[in-house]
C-alpha cells in the first residue's frame, strides 16, 4: 500500500464519507450480490438489508427496493444522480461506485442508496489528485453520506479532506526539499 493510499484509506475511515469494502468482501460478477448480503456494517450491506431483491448483470449490481424506503428525490426535489462512492481494493487500488440513481429517506435524513445500478469502475489514478478532483467537481452533490447512522455535511467532509490534502502537500514539499 502506497503512502498516498494509506492516507486516503485513513481518510475514508475517519470521515465516514465513503464506503470501504475489500475485494474479497464484494466478490465479482454474479457473486457480488451474495457478498453484499453478508456485509451488515457496510453501506451496501445496509442497502441490501432494505432491498427486496438483489441481482447482478455483468459489472452492475442492481438493487430493488419497495414500500416507503425509497424516495425519488431529495427534500429540495433534486435527484442524486451524480454521487460517487469510493472503495479500497485489497491490493491498494481504488474503485468507484457511480450511477447512484435514487436516494433513500430514513429518520428524516437522506441515505445515498439506489434501487438503480451501481457501476464498479477500477480507479488507477493518483489518490491525492483524485481527492482534489472530488472536492472541485463533486462538492455540490456531496450532501452527506450515511454509513453507520452519521450524516457528514459538505463542510465537515471538506474539513476532513482538506486536512489530509494539507498533509499530502507537506509530504510532497519535504520530498522535494530532500531531492534538492
Role assignments for model-derived ranges:
Residues 1-102, 164-180:
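A surface-exposed partner-binding patch
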Residues 1-5, 36, 53, 120-124, ...:
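Intrinsic-disorder-associated interaction segments
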Residues 14, 24, 70, 101, ...:
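A generic structural signal for solvent-exposed, polar alpha-helical segments
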Residues 64-67, 106, 130, 147-154, ...:
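Solvent-exposed, non-transmembrane amphipathic alpha-helical segments
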Residues 81, 107-109, 153-157:
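Glycine-rich, flexible loop segments associated with nucleotide phosphate handling
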Residues 106-144:
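Compact, glycine/acidic-enriched structural inserts
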Residues 141-180:
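Acidic, proline/glycine-rich low-complexity IDRs
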Amino acid at each position: 500500500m502506497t503512502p498516498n493510499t494509506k492516507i486516503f484509506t485513513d481518510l475514508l475511515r475517519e470521515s465516514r464519507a465513503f464506503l470501504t469494502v475489500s475485494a474479497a468482501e464484494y466478490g465479482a460478477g454474479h457473486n457480488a450480490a451474495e457478498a453484499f448480503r453478508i456485509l451488515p456494517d457496510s453501506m451496501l450491506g445496509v442497502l441490501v438489508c432494505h432491498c427486496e431483491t438483489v441481482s447482478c448483470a455483468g459489472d452492475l449490481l442492481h438493487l430493488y427496493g419497495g414500500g416507503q424506503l425509497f424516495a425519488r428525490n431529495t427534500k429540495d426535489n433534486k435527484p442524486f444522480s451524480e454521487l460517487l462512492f469510493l472503495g479500497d481494493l485489497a491490493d491498494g487500488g481504488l474503485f468507484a461506485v457511480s450511477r447512484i440513481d435514487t436516494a433513500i429517506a430514513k429518520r428524516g435524513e437522506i441515505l445515498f442508496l439506489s434501487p438503480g445500478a451501481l457501476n464498479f469502475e477500477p480507479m488507477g489514478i493518483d489518490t491525492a489528485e483524485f481527492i482534489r478532483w472530488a472536492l472541485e467537481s463533486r462538492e455540490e452533490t456531496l450532501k452527506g453520506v450515511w454509513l453507520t447512522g452519521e450524516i457528514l455535511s459538505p463542510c465537515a467532509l471538506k474539513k476532513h479532506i482538506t486536512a489530509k490534502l494539507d498533509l499530502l502537500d507537506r509530504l510532497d514539499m519535504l520530498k522535494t526539499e530532500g531531492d534538492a
